[in-house]
Amino acid sequence: MPTYIKRHLRSLAVPRTWPVPRKSRGYWIVKPSPGPHSKEFAMPIAVWLRDYLGLAENMREVRYLLNNGKVLVDGRPIKDYKFPVGLFDVLAIPEINEYYRVLLDERGKLYLKKIDKEEANIKYGKIIRKVSVRGGKIQYTLTDGRTFLGDNSYKTHYGVVYEIPNFKIREVIPLEKDRKAYIIRGKHTGRIGVIKEVIKTDMPWPNIVRLEVAGEVGETWLDNIIPVPENFEA
């Protein structure tokens, strides 16, 4: 039997993080292209424009906006209507002076937080991988797939603040006590906590972090947080 590649998702099968009704647009909804974000933390740009922002009535209008360079993601025009726009990405429509950052609300749903033009030049992420390369350098990989070279000063799970579209690092946030962290899974999803302790566990279990959120102290897996700067607002 031939194998067919599905171009759409059943609307009932969309991730629970997507802020669209599970029966929206009938039986099917646009499936995201492969990208650095998992489906849990990203939606196709067409869904953001049509179903969330209401800037298009149909896919024809979505394609018009994209093909005419009216929509930017992280400062660059996007043509692919299935392009995944995910956590911390910056979605911009300069023609109408609208700028947004993808975040999670306290229900665990993705949403677009309105930001100003200056803030749209900044992005947040986390180091998820580090490997040695030629020349004695270390290559670091961030949550959105970007990479940079450096010495061995940083560790995985450190937060990073950088400029877009020209990738320039502004700050690296260590994973340490009293640093702020953005929570992406669990009871306090979408909120900012203060790190109280990082608890190392035996392999293969991930490490645990103890956080204080709104006066309440709790624990979660280290993979569920991203260190952020002091001025970060959810």
From Swiss-Prot:
One of its GO terms (cellular component) is cytosolic small ribosomal subunit. Pfam families: KOW, Ribosomal_S4e, RS4NT, S4. Residues 43-106 form the S4 RNA-binding domain. One of its GO terms (biological process) is translation. Keywords: Ribonucleoprotein, Ribosomal protein, RNA-binding, rRNA-binding. GO terms for molecular function: rRNA binding; structural constituent of ribosome. It comes from the Archaea. HAMAP family: Ribosomal_eS4 (MF_00485). Belongs to the eukaryotic ribosomal protein eS4 family. This is Small ribosomal subunit protein eS4. It comes from Nanoarchaeum equitans (strain Kin4-M). The lineage of its organism: Archaea, Nanobdellota, Candidatus Nanoarchaeia, Nanoarchaeales, Nanoarchaeaceae.
